[in-house]
Amino acid sequence: MSSKEQKTPNEQVSEEMENTAEQQVEATQETGECVDPRVAELEVQLSDALQRERESLLRAKAEVENIRRRTELDVEKAHKFALERFSSELLPVIDNLERALDTADKTNTELTSMIEGVELTLKSLLDAVGKFGIEVVGETHVPFNPEVHQAMTMLESADHEPNHVMMVMQKGYTLNGRLLRPAMVAVSKAKS
């Protein structure tokens, strides 16, 4: 027998009871004997009990299957988003490294090696968090998306289409498609 054809003990007992009841009903009908009304009533009760047990078994199987599916989804979500709190704590570190690079005096030759070190550290950190599903939301000239952008201001602009991101004040981040922090942006509007 294949694994699909194998039956659980409950299924076997239920099937045997059903077969026995059907054989008794058929034997009674074939012989044409006059059946005691009490026997007929008991056969009806037996048939009803079998039907109830069969339905109960099906409901129990469905419930077990639903629990298994929910558990699989919960485990999958736990694996996928286990890093959410840790990732959120890393975002200020990334911001500080970016601010350090933005404010660094790149014309000072004495700071060149330090600036390169900070750039490499930032790149290494972004590569490391990227391996775990963290993505940067910080593009300009893209349509404003309230799911990943937080509009801080709206500015008139002839250079940008209306409702497009003009400037990113603070980058946002997603973890496996789930928003960790929205990007703070300036949004363009049509000139009046």
UniProtKB/Swiss-Prot annotation:
It holds the Pfam family GrpE. This is Protein GrpE. Homodimer. Participates actively in the response to hyperosmotic and heat shock by preventing the aggregation of stress-denatured proteins, in association with DnaK and GrpE. It is the nucleotide exchange factor for DnaK and may function as a thermosensor. Unfolded proteins bind initially to DnaJ; upon interaction with the DnaJ-bound protein, DnaK hydrolyzes its bound ATP, resulting in the formation of a stable complex. GrpE releases ADP from DnaK; ATP binding to DnaK triggers the release of the substrate protein, thus completing the reaction cycle. Belongs to the GrpE family. PROSITE patterns: GRPE. It comes from the Bacteria. InterPro entries: GrpE (IPR000740), GrpE_coiled_coil (IPR013805), GrpE_head (IPR009012). It comes from Yersinia pestis (strain Pestoides F). One of its GO terms (biological process) is protein folding. The keyword Hydrolase does not apply. Coiled coil: none annotated. NCBIfam families: PRK14139.1, PRK14140.1, PRK14150.1. Transmembrane segments: none annotated. The lineage of its organism: Bacteria, Pseudomonadati, Pseudomonadota, Gammaproteobacteria, Enterobacterales. It is found in: Cytoplasm. The keyword Chaperone applies. Residues 1-34 are annotated as: Disordered. Residues 20-31 have a biased composition (Polar residues). GO terms for molecular function: adenyl-nucleotide exchange factor activity; protein homodimerization activity; protein-folding chaperone binding; unfolded protein binding. Its main location: cytoplasm. GO terms for cellular component: cytosol. Keywords: Chaperone, Cytoplasm, Stress response.
